[in-house]
Design a protein with these regions (language model features):
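Flexible, acidic/Gly-rich N-terminal and inter-domain linker regions that tether
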Residues: 1-66, 371, 379-380, 387-408, ...
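Conserved C-terminal portion of the radical SAM core fold
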Residues: 173, 188-265, 274-300
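Core AdoMet radical
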Residues: 77-92, 99-125, 131-152, 159-210, ...
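Cys/His/Pro-rich metal-binding microdomains
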Residues: 68, 72-75
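C-terminal extensions
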Residues: 306-336, 362-422
Length: 422
């Protein structure tokens, strides 16, 4: 690898680091004779783990950080005086293959600034994926960031070679997008999303009729929203996410806490730290929407338009509805057990299965994996000595569960807990 390409790599990897929608999840490509690489499905993270324990990494890079747009919130905006670089299609393909051969990566996450026009940029992204698949027989994971405003033909071609395509909404409300990025609009984002959805549904029907039809975007599509750069409430953001999840091909909405990279622009809020706690709460609420059968209006409403930063959304909901608790863990249905703070999907299923043979008590629940520190106030079962939420009052339970602030709070330190026990 020559020094010129290494210098470009350093610049373009730095420019790509603010994109959080990087995931090697949702698709499996097994190594086949005559192909290079393989990937194992993971869950929504840049680094995933294969079945044999290997750590899976993606090369996360931009094709170029030159851009014709001057978005206020973007480090790569046209007016910024920053180091710029562009990789040719062949340079990026060779870089990906070389990194794979060295066992640095298992896949590619590729985005780009927009140069000339959306179609010109999209065509170059497609060429990278096409050359990797057809010329080098690369069988690893490829995630392409589709360019807003790109043509249907290019989006459809990209879908033949990429495992996942994503088009970023960036700012949830169009009027706020126009304030910070006057050259952009939501129409140019939603149109490629529709192309991807139509392509997936058409491909699904074709595969029923013809045996060897290639798969189209097997890992579906995703999008990303910036949180904290504008005035949207969490309610606005979650309603938009919920509507996006109604589309069968939308696999993931990512939330990126606004990082103040262009402090000179007075249209932007002067934040000392990115709103990481808020970002974390949005991910937890998103989890409730997708896996816990919650509706948006149960998590946020006109009275509570923003998520509580001190407690997680499920606990917040339970404390607002003490009349529904405590539930008898040995009698309640699965849907209600799933809503108990401290009980995740896996634990709820184990509870349903285990109670058929014997009544469950404190120690059985703890052994299953229930976080009794939270759950004990919302359930009744054999041998449970703790008083419930109605006896202690929601305020009392909240006081017991909210962590006591330390002398010096470091807002940067967070535990993004998306384990089973939510």
């Amino acid at each position: 690898m020559n020094e010129n390409v290494l210098a470009k790599l350093k610049v373009l990897a730095e420019s790509a680091k603010y994109d959080v929608s990087c995931s090697s999840s949702g698709t499996v490509r097994r190594n086949q004779s005559g192909t290079l690489g393989n990937t194992v499905g993971g869950w929504g993270i840049c680094h995933s783990f294969a079945e044999d324990g290997r750590c899976i990494s993606l090369l996360k890079i931009m094709l170029t950080n030159y851009c014709i747009y001057d978005c206020a919130y973007c480090i790569n905006r046209r007016s910024n005086d920053i180091p710029r670089a562009t990789l040719s299609v062949s340079e990026l393909v060779d870089l990906t293959i070389e990194f794979y051969r060295r066992n640095y990566i298992e896949g590619l996450f590729l985005s780009s600034g927009v140069v000339r026009n959306p179609d010109y940029t999209m065509e170059r992204l497609v060429r990278v994926a096409k050359d990797l698949r057809l010329v080098h027989k690369f069988n690893g994971y490829i995630h392409l960031k589709s360019i807003p405003g790109a043509s249907r033909e290019l989006v459809n071609e990209a879908g033949l070679y990429a495992d996942r395509l994503s088009v970023d909404i960036e700012i949830p409300k169009e009027e706020n997008l126009k304030l910070l990025a006057p050259e952009k609009d939501h129409k140019s984002v939603y149109q490629p999303m529709r192309y991807i959805q139509q392509g997936v549904l058409t491909n699904k029907e074709d595969r029923k009729k013809f045996r060897h039809v290639p798969r189209f975007v097997p890992a579906g599509q995703s999008t990303q929203m910036i949180v904290g750069a504008t005035t949207e409430s969490d309610k606005d953001i979650l309603y938009l996410s919920s509507s996006l999840y109604q589309h069968p091909t939308m696999r993931r909405v990512y939330y990126s806490g606004y990082i103040s990279v262009n402090t000179y622009d007075k249209r932007l809020p002067a934040l000392k730290q990115p709103p990481l706690v808020r970002e974390n709460r949005l991910y937890q609420a998103d989890w409730l929407l997708r896996f816990y059968q919650f509706k948006v209006e149960e998590i946020v409403d006109d009275s509570y338009p923003d998520l509580d930063l001190e407690i997680d959304p499920k606990l917040g909901w339970a404390l607002r509805h003490p009349e529904l608790f405590p539930i008898d863990i040995n009698q309640a249905d699965y849907e209600m057990i799933l809503r108990v703070p401290g009980i995740g999907i896996k634990s709820a299923r184990q509870i349903i299965a285990s109670r058929r043979f014997s009544k469950l008590g404190f120690y059985e629940l703890k052994k299953i994996g229930v976080v009794m520190k939270k759950a004990q106030y919302f359930i009744t079962c054999n041998e449970l000595p703790t008083r419930t939420v109605n006896e202690l009052t929601p305020t009392g339970v909240r006081r017991l569960l909210v962590p006591k602030p330390k002398k010096k709070v470091d807002e940067r330190q967070l535990i993004l807990n998306f384990t089973d026990n939510e």
